[in-house]
């Protein structure tokens, strides 16, 4: 028998979206050439390989994000110490909304693509694929 949750995943995402910076896909596409912007792909590596990725994006597994951005963590990645605007995305914008809300609460400023990589593709954003 399924357990009753105190809050649904949809409610968590809605709460996150209410407190973070969202960038729609069209505006995000305009930033792809900006050297001051770093796109961060939270999708599973299999999603990235299957669907392609935003050119120049950095792959950061969702489960490691908080550790990779924290300079005091043994898992810290130097890219997150750069003076850039970080724009996170996933496939539909749900995981990235939750991620950015968590990162903002840690003091790490970031934004996300509202409807994710799916909308990026729909809006004609550039996509790279590895052979």
Predicted regions and their residues:
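Active-site flanking residues adjacent to catalytic metal/cofactor-binding acidic residues
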Residues: 40
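Short, surface-exposed ligand- or partner-binding patches at beta-edge/loop junctions that are enriched
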Residues: 89
């Amino acid at each position: 028998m399924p357990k009753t949750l105190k809050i649904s995943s949809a409610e968590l995402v809605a709460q996150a979206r209410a407190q973070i910076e969202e960038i729609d896909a069209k505006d995000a596409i305009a930033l792809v050439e900006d050297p001051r912007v770093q796109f961060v792909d939270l999708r599973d590596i299999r999603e990235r390989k299957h669907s392609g990725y935003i050119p120049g994006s950095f792959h950061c597994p969702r489960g490691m994000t908080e550790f990779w951005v924290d300079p005091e963590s043994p898992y810290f990645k130097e890219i997150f110490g750069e003076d850039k605007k970080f724009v996170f995305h996933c496939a539909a914008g749900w995981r990235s909304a939750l991620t950015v809300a968590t990162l903002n609460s840690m003091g790490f400023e970031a934004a996300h693509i509202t409807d994710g990589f799916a909308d990026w593709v729909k809006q004609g954003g550039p996509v790279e694929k590895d052979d």
